[in-house]
UniProtKB/Swiss-Prot annotation:
SUPFAM superfamilies membership: Ankyrin repeat
Occurrences of domain F-box (ranges): 541-574
Superkingdom of origin organism: Viruses
Recorded family membership: Belongs to the poxvirinae B18 protein family.
Phylogenetic placement of the source organism: Viruses, Varidnaviria, Bamfordvirae, Nucleocytoviricota, Pokkesviricetes
The protein's name: Ankyrin repeat protein B19
Classification via SMART domains: ANK (SM00248)
Keywords, in A-Z order: ANK repeat, Repeat
Positions of ANK repeats: 56-87, 135-164, 167-213, 217-249, 253-285, 327-356
UniProt xrefs under InterPro entries: Ank_repeat_dom-contain_49, Ankyrin_rpt, Ankyrin_rpt-contain_sf, F-box_dom, PRANC_domain
Amino acid sequence: MSRRLIYVLNINRESTHKIQENEIYTYFSHCNIDHTSTELDFVVKNYDLNRRQPVTGYTALHCYLYNNYFTNDVLKILLNHGVDVTMKTSSGRMPVYILLTRCCNISHDVVIDMIDKDKNHLLHRDYSNLLLEYIKSRYMLLKEEDIDENIVSTLLDKGIDPNFKQDGYTALHYYYLCLAHVYKPGECRKPITIKKAKRIISLFIQHGANLNALDNCGNTPFHLYLSIEMCNNIHMTKMLLTFNPNFEICNNHGLTPILCYITSDYIQHDILVMLIHHYETNVGEMPIDERRIIVFEFIKTYSTRPADSITYLMNRFKNIDIYTRYEGKTLLHVACEYNNTHVIDYLIRINGDINALTDNNKHATQLIIDNKENSPYTINCLLYILRYIVDKNVIRSLVDQLPSLPIFDIKSFEKFISYCILLDDTFYNRHVRNRDSKTYRYAFSKYMSFDKYDGIITKCHKETILLKLSTVLDTTLYAVLRCHNSKKLRRYLTELKKYNNDKSFKIYSNIMNERYLNVYYKDMYVSKVYDKLFPVFTDKNCLLTLLPSEIIYEILYMLTINDLYNISYPPTKV
């Protein structure tokens, strides 16, 4: 901030011309005062600095503490010239309160000076909220200001109760919020080093602070810290765990600290692992209900490495599997409902049933459609799971809901329709029959014109005719793309590769590529596993030697790609 005088006090006046109150108010409230200036020297020697403004009750000291050009040097001069540090404003504000909650770049020395000038010291009830308000101001107002370790230490040493509550919060609640928001994206806050944060928390504990104090919502400071959307604050979290916060306290919503983290807007995989490990090491085995909630709630939340996290959770909590239900839904149902494609992929690879219904008879596709909050991703998620759906009734139900599906990406919508036409033989004919119906045509007006929709369907239909005319050994390309059995598709692998490069298929080339890659990787991993287990198959002491290699291949093809991959590359234990 540039040093610019807003107001210049006239000191060359006759002795009969006294300094007016409004002049002092303007001077101390708005001027960028130089502590060596003749104006300041003139004022402190010729004006009663403890004279109060009639309405606000401000003295010269109060005015200066609210000055945006505040400096410690000027404040020291005022303190040395007898300002009364115990006088309150009309609103009840003490000077030391204004200093700690309003001023920037405060010197520890001036805080000590001001406190020492008060004969009541800080044990008086007027000062009971001073420490809390000091830290709160750095959290809410002065976000770029540092929390001075020496000031915190002084306030605690002078007898301020660290467990004093205001609106349910203690000073530690606000300090933990400061620590969390330092790492929150978009926040412009001064960094807090881990060593300094640890020293300040240690100061609180040494002076009797309750690390597990509850606010009005039942949250401990650690609850609040974990509930804030954070980014890469692994080391800070690790430091806070050294104070061994209580992991079993539930807030008013029934959430423990770990569940607060799981239900926040952002999950860091390494922090999740760290929290669970700390719980099991220091508390013991986690209750089954909490384990179940952790896994199900995790799926609903954005995370940095969802595939790694769900794998870790499923391996860690052995009694949670693909059949486990919570509120009538399986893990796969929840993953579909919240468009978590990474988790969907993992659960299907470990044999999760995409066609299973919820307790109230809803299919996964219906859960995706019903979740309006995720409407921008509805088509893409439906498109993602269509490759796993074989129930024609489900496909037909999807087709019937096409007019109401939100369209945010026309290319994804075209691909979705191409899948529906491929998997539902009756789709095109039913569309043609209803083409002239005004009710049918009007249903599509919300997201796109009917003519555009009709054009997409016609284009897809023409290409399906071309698929039916394209022969692949003893069948057609149309039948191959509709087949989900990778063992049957294996014999068409070479032909699929050839058609995959055929430029005449513009719409179905992506589906061809998916089919080809699925079969290719399945065949590759079957061969890898067979080669790896070959010494076992050929061991004369093993009964498997009695089986022909064709039968062994049949057995291996019954496994999922995930199973085959784990046999080929055994996962390390977490």
